[in-house]
Structure formats: C-alpha cells, structure tokens
C-alpha cells in the first residue's frame, strides 16, 4: 500500500480499531469497472464500488468462509480467509439486459431489494430461501443506469442484500 510517498504493509489487528476522526477511502483503486463476467474476490473487490459495465455480465460473489483457520494459526492470523463482513457495492453504469449477481449456489441471499419505475410505482423483493441469483434486465427487473445493490457476507451460507434500489420500466416483476 502507498501512504504519501511511502509503502505501507498490510496490517492485521485482532482487536477493535478506533478512529476518532474516521477513515476515508479514496483514490483510483476505490472503483473497479467490471466489463466481463467476473469471479469476485474479497481482496480485489470487497469495500470498493463495483461499476457494472457489461449488460449481460455474470458477477459471482466469493464463497463465504466462516472459519478458515490453518492448522498452525488462529483467528488473528493474517492469512485467515474468514470473510464475514465483506461488503460488495454494485453500481449499474451500463444498463442491464441480462445481468446477474450470483453466489456459488450454496450461499443464499437474505434481505430486500426495492425496485422502482419512472411512474412512481415500487415493489419490494424478498428473496426465497433458495434464492442465489439477482437478475436485472433493464426493464421489469430493474438494472437501469443508477441502480445500486449492496451485499454483505453475514453468516455461513448467507449474504445480506441491503441498501439496494433497482431502477426499471414497465410492470415490475421479481
């Protein structure tokens, strides 16, 4: 990592980190343009704004790991792959035609997505227990430019969908 003119190594804290004046994440690495089908990773994509620029893209979230301790290290190990709390923020920059945000098939979505259309109609979508795909088509299922979806790994096999608004046209479908 670069800090000023200095390189800063990755640092792992095992206890809480307090900032009395906040953390500000800025710079060119804070947005990533997704221009093709992408298998997302925590290291490259979590906590960043993911600009979806593939109208029929398939963006696959990483498998949720709740306990990834190695045989020689524990919860505070730098190489522990536990990804609970990893958040993925999507912004539709190119209107969807058949765009999917999907899990590995084992992880499922919980939470709600609000879909709104230009005549003021809106509809909330609550995923079924088996739901592992969010599909946008730029019309009845949302996905127009400006749509946003946020998902966070919250537990074994569970991604929370929150702070999400899909913009669409015509009669809303779920």
Report the location of each language-model feature.
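Short linear motifs centered on Gly/Pro in flexible linkers and helix caps
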Residues: 3, 33-35, 128
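Exposed extracellular interaction/assembly regions and N-terminal maturation sites
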Residues: 12-121, 156-174
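Extracellular disulfide-bonded cysteine-rich modules/repeats
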Residues: 145-153
């Amino acid at each position: 990592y670069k800090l000023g003119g200095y390189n800063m190594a990755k640092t792992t804290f095992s206890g809480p980190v307090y900032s009395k004046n906040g953390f500000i994440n800025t710079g060119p690495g804070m947005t990533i343009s997704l221009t093709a089908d992408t298998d997302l990773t925590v290291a490259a994509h979590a906590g960043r704004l993911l600009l979806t620029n593939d109208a029929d893209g398939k963006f696959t979230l990483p498998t949720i790991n709740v306990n990834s301790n190695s045989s020689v290290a524990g919860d505070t190990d730098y190489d522990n792959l536990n990804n609970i709390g990893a958040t993925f923020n999507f912004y539709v920059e190119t209107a969807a035609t058949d765009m999917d945000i999907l899990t590995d098939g084992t992880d499922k979505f919980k939470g709600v997505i609000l879909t709104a259309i230009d005549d003021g109609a809106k509809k909330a979508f609550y995923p079924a227990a088996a739901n592992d795909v969010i599909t946008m088509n730029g019309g009845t299922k949302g996905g127009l430019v400006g749509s946003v979806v946020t998902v966070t790994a919250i537990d074994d096999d569970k991604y929370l969908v929150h702070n999400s608004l899909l913009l669409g046209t015509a009669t809303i479908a779920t």
